[in-house]
């Protein structure tokens, strides 16, 4: 998942064609973008698709993992929390979609709550991805199961991820409010008095650092050493794990690297390290909208990366269907699925 900022941060709707961060000065005149309305509705459709796909995919992941109480692995616990984070994030998308059209019409309380929920689940998702990479590193490079299989330790790590996510998200809860500038649509964003612009840069750099750069280096380090170990092993089953690891890193980079590069350029422009112009502002605004879509898409792809790509997940899902009489034992036999009463589901064995 990246940093994911609320849609109103990038598109200021005093007029449907105005773009830019919501100004503190009510006499501010932002740049115009003639095709902003079209872009707005493209984003709305994307929010809807991501919401539906994430709701379905992550719900299925949680269902399969929760059914595997006996054989649940450490990675399964991480995946369960990751699916929950993605699911909770997806639940906020309809509200942001409505705000794209009508501005923020939900008041300050919901502005704070929804912003907190979105940021918490963004941070927790990224931190859990990093934890999964550390777990794979220990299991593959050091063949360490004593540490990673301690359930109470894993639960503590997951709780720590949620707790740290809450701490990192507190500024959004404390300072965000519904704000209605003169002659403009209402917005949900941070209001910090005369220092709002400066603190908004801090709140942008914070998630850029903790939400992408740090987890990325952790993942690259852990998966890099894991891949080296697997290449030396020359084992067929481990080559399958290599493909999954490649998919994890590749999809993460494809989803979040473009957005964070554009976000970095936008931050440099707004801190006057690179020259700001209406043309550049509009280009960056378009790029942020486009690359943000990739970031949102990551919450839909997580079930594919960590679950659907694994044969055991498909078998586990079929076992659940068989337990409820939706498929026959003959169907399971044709698909080489062991009896659903003889073994439990393990989602992550192919990771």
Swiss-Prot record:
Lineage top rank: taxon: Eukaryota
Principal location listed in the UniProt entry: membrane
MF annotations from Gene Ontology: C-C chemokine binding; C-C chemokine receptor activity; C-X-C chemokine receptor activity; interleukin-8 binding
Pfam families according to UniProt: 7tm_1
Topology feature Cytoplasmic, residues: 68-76, 134-154, 231-243, 311-351
SUPFAM superfamilies from the UniProt entry: Family A G protein-coupled receptor-like
Positions of transmembrane segments: 47-67, 77-97, 113-133, 155-175, 210-230, 244-264, 290-310
Localization annotation: Cell membrane
Membrane topology of this protein: Multi-pass membrane protein
Cysteines engaged in disulfide bonds, as pairs: 111-188
Extracellular compartment residues: 1-46, 98-112, 176-209, 265-289
GO cellular component annotations of the record: external side of plasma membrane
Annotated keywords: Cell membrane, Chemotaxis, Disulfide bond, G-protein coupled receptor, Glycoprotein, Membrane, Receptor, Transducer, Transmembrane, Transmembrane helix
PANTHER family, per database record: C-X-C CHEMOKINE RECEPTOR TYPE 1, CELL ADHESION MOLECULE
Annotated function: Receptor to interleukin-8, which is a powerful neutrophils chemotactic factor. Binding of IL-8 to the receptor causes activation of neutrophils. This response is mediated via a G-protein that activates a phosphatidylinositol-calcium second messenger system.
Family: Belongs to the G-protein coupled receptor 1 family.
Name by which UniProt lists this protein: C-X-C chemokine receptor type 1
The organism of origin for this protein: Pongo pygmaeus
């Amino acid at each position: 998942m990246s940093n994911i900022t609320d849609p109103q941060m990038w598109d200021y709707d005093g007029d449907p064609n105005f773009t830019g961060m919501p100004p503190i000065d009510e006499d501010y005149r932002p740049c115009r973008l003639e095709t902003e309305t079209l872009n707005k509705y493209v984003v709305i459709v994307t929010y809807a698709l991501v919401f539906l796909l994430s709701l379905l995919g992550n719900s299925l992941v949680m269902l399969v993992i929760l059914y595997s109480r006996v054989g649940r692995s450490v990675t399964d616990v991480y995946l369960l929390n990751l699916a929950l984070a993605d699911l909770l994030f997806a639940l906020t998308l309809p509200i942001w979609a409505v705000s794209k059209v009508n501005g923020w019409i939900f008041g300050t309380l919901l502005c704070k709550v929804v912003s907190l929920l979105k940021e918490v689940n963004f941070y927790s998702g990224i931190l859990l991805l990093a934890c999964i990479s550390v777990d794979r590193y220990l299991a593959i490079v050091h063949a360490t199961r004593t540490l990673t299989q301690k359930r109470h330790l894993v639960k503590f790590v997951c709780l720590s991820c949620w707790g740290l996510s809450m701490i990192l998200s507190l500024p959004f809860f404390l300072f965000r409010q519904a704000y209605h500038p003169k002659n403009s649509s209402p917005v949900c964003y941070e209001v910090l008095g005369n220092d709002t612009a400066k603190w908004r840069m801090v709140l942008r750099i914070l998630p850029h650092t903790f939400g992408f750069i740090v987890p990325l280096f952790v993942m690259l380090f852990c998966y890099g050493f894991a891949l080296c170990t697997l290449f030396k092993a020359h084992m067929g089953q481990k080559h399958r794990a290599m493909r999954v690891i490649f998919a994890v890193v590749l999809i993460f980079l494809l989803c979040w690297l473009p957005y964070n590069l554009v976000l970095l350029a936008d931050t440099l422009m707004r801190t006057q390290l690179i020259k700001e112009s209406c043309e550049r502002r509009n280009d960056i605004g378009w790029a942020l909208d486009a690359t943000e879509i990739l970031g949102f898409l990551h919450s839909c792809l997580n079930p594919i990366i960590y679950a659907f790509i694994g044969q055991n997940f498909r078998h586990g899902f079929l076992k659940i269907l068989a337990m409820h009489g939706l498929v026959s034992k003959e169907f399971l036999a044709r698909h080489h699925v062991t009896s659903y009463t003889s073994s439990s589901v393990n989602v992550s064995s192919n990771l």
